[in-house]
Amino acid sequence: PGAAYQPSVNGVNIYVSKMGNTLTLKQYAQTIGTWPVKLGRRSETGDKVQEGDEITPSGSFYVCTRNDQSICYLALGLSYPNAEDAERGLRDGLINEEQYNAIVEANKAGIQPPWNTPLGGAIEIHGDQGGGTSGCIAVTNDVMDILWEYCPLGVPVTVGP
């Protein structure tokens, strides 16, 4: 999926490069930092299709949850699946019309979409960077402290090449 322009929150936005294995945090035109990330173990094989494929999804998302009780230190939940993912899932027979509508409506409302469909969910930017993930974006805890400070709910996150 292409990365569409998204308005920022307080000028803040995040770009994750799957090819570069980096996360860049910007506020307005200023780069706050670029750091290494660990992605889903199978992310080099393409875009996320369904739960359990261990691929970090590509596309335009927003921070829809903030968890300070995460087993991975701190976690910013992303709005995967987005409307494009829902369209693909419905077309390919992975989800039904009701699940499709719930995902699309949640994305329109700027809230957490259902994370319990066959498309998967609970894709987060989180700390405790170790090896590859099951689809999340892992950074070190010191980087997570910075992201936590800058990123309220609604901050746009683009995951691209």
Regions found by a protein language model. Give the residues of each.
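Soluble periplasmic/extracytoplasmic beta-strand elements of cell-envelope proteins
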Residues: 13-15, 22-24, 36, 62, ...
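Exported/periplasmic cell-wall-interacting domains
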Residues: 65-161
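Arginine residue identity/basic-tract feature
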Residues: 26, 38-42, 66, 88-91
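N-terminal short leaders/motifs
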Residues: 8-24, 77-84, 89-92
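N-terminal post-signal-peptidase region of extra-cytosolic proteins
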Residues: 2-14, 18-19, 36-65, 141-142
